[in-house]
Amino acid sequence: MAKVRFKYKGEEKEVDTSKIKKVWRVGKMVSFTYDDNGKTGRGAVSEKDAPKELMDMLARAEKKK
């Protein structure tokens, strides 16, 4: 699986796409929640910086609506 690199509250983070639970679009950003060792973490990345796997997850989520 691919890793998503993003900044959250000024801190550089990286999360594996297999840990991502929910994905949605906010303007030109892709927001997501992920499993952070039992807690729910949040992150966002621009569409142009998002890996293909994350964009595929977003397309599946939007298709369900």
From Swiss-Prot:
It holds the Pfam family 7kD_DNA_binding. Hyperthermostable. Keywords: Cytoplasm, DNA-binding, Methylation. The modification N6-methyllysine is found at K7, K63, K64. Lys-63 was found to be 25% monomethylated and Lys-64 was found to be 36% monomethylated. GO terms for molecular function: DNA binding; RNA endonuclease activity. Highly stable from pH 0 to pH 12. It is found in: Cytoplasm. GO terms for cellular component: cytoplasm. The keyword Cytoplasm applies. Can constrain negative DNA supercoils. May be involved in maintaining the integrity of the genome at high temperature. Monomer. Belongs to the 7 kDa DNA-binding/endoribonuclease P2 family. 7e possesses the tighter binding as compared to that of the proteins 7a and 7b, which may be due to the three supplementary lysines in the C-terminal region. This is DNA-binding protein 7e. It comes from Sulfolobus acidocaldarius (strain ATCC 33909 / DSM 639 / JCM 8929 / NBRC 15157 / NCIMB 11770). The lineage of its organism: Archaea, Thermoproteota, Thermoprotei, Sulfolobales, Sulfolobaceae.
